[in-house]
Amino acid sequence: MKKSEFTENPAPVELEGTVLRICFDTEEVDQVINNGEEGQEPATRKVYLAYVIRVNNPFTLENVTKALLKEGFDEFKAVAVAAESLLTANEAGLLPGNALELARQMQIARISEYDASDAVNQFSFDDVPMWLDKDTRNGLIARLNAEKAVGKTTSTLWLGTQSFTITPDAGLQLLSALEVYASECYDKTAEHKTAIVALNDVDAIKSYDFTQGYPAHLEF
């Protein structure tokens, strides 16, 4: 989805008759309006770029989320933006709604989005950042154990077109450490979600720092 351009900072939510316009991920940029042609000095102007969706009534979390999914955003992003937009509209008096529940839905989706990002799902091997999901880890464990059983002393692992040579024992040790790391991250994510559900104040939920407490990235 391409961002739309505005000459002024757009409101995050706005009613256009019976349609709710939602602007998000807004950024301010300097746009070149000439290239110093004909002896002129280069000039720029401030513009705002934002993703824009428009949703017809009823303005429910489900409907707004569906509109975002249709535009290609993933589920966590869609729910987070939908809940935040409806919460903003509620706080501005534009729409009714359960502010507390919307705040919880927003933060829980953000936590899930963060948990799935490189901020959590990343380690480095020989200074190369990478990640192995659980299915891949399990497959590698089976492979390395099999290679160890038949007496192989080295194994070649691939990340795209890049290869890494490692001994089966070192590979199994790496995967064990990675499994512990992934488990600790899972526990921390669950802890944050539980904390959000327990909060009964919208401002406290909105200001909750769900990035805290995760283990440091592993380096091998």
Residue ranges and their predicted role:
Residues 49-53:
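Protein-protein interaction/assembly regions in multi-subunit complexes
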Residues 1-19, 26-45, 55-220:
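A preference for well-ordered globular domain cores
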